[in-house]
Amino acid sequence: HGEYVHTETGKFLTGEQRALFVNGNIVYNGRLFKEIFFEPASPSSSFELKAVTIGRNFHWQRQEDQCFKGAFNLVTGENGIVVINQVDVEEYLTSVISSEMSAQASKELLKAHAVISRSWLLAQIEKNFRLGRKEEKQQNCYRDNEQLIRWYDREDHNIFDVCADDHCQRYQGITRASNPIVQEVIHETRGEILVNGETICDARFSKCCGGVTEQFEHCWEPIPHSYLTALRDSRETTFPDLTQEEEARKWIHSAPNAFCNTADKKILCQVLNNYDQETTDFYRWKVFYKQEELAELIHRKSG
């Protein structure tokens, strides 16, 4: 949609282009590359990727065609070609808040989402910068005589800032922002972030929950964050000690009142994208494993 420029040759491109991954190289127009750069010929130029996998390793995994703006480059990955979209923060957020939630959600919800997602993004970029400068060290495994604690997926992205799927934040292209309110929201919150002292908050969010949030250090990395503590997802603020087995069992086998525990189709249609509405048991659910599946899972996760 519009022209792009292949930066190495200066050639203007329109229409369908094809690149193949062969023996660790990108084959494009009969030549081998490790990386290829494309720049938009105008701000209105956009490109479409075919059969993009979304919801990777989740039960809603599927493929869809997606359209993006901005520059992009193709890079050789371990198992194929990686597409990296170079886009500014506010353009990125326009897609994120209408990919994670529906563009038809209320304006105030989308504004809150924009601030949270902007904060999370900048916190990750800042953290990666510190790690790159070796100002901060990241440890992924802790072991003593009684326990092994292993943290996963924290170093998955070393050639780009964040991925486009649920592992980071959904970034599913410009067509998701179907409501003009999305652009208004990004404009009105431009540059707004959450801070704790002089530090950008590593803000986290979820569409569904179990009725109580977990402390940051028990989910993401063993560093307490005073602004990400255990809270009840309800007007009622008290909850049992869920570190106790019996209390946790009672909580899980019941369905306490919670903001995220709703079956109101009007609300769900307003805030969720179509494929998210396919899942109805998002507050309490069951998963069944065979004995050999559990054994394999424990072996894989424990190393």
Spans of model-derived segments:
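Conserved, single-site charged/polar hotspot
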Residues: 1-303
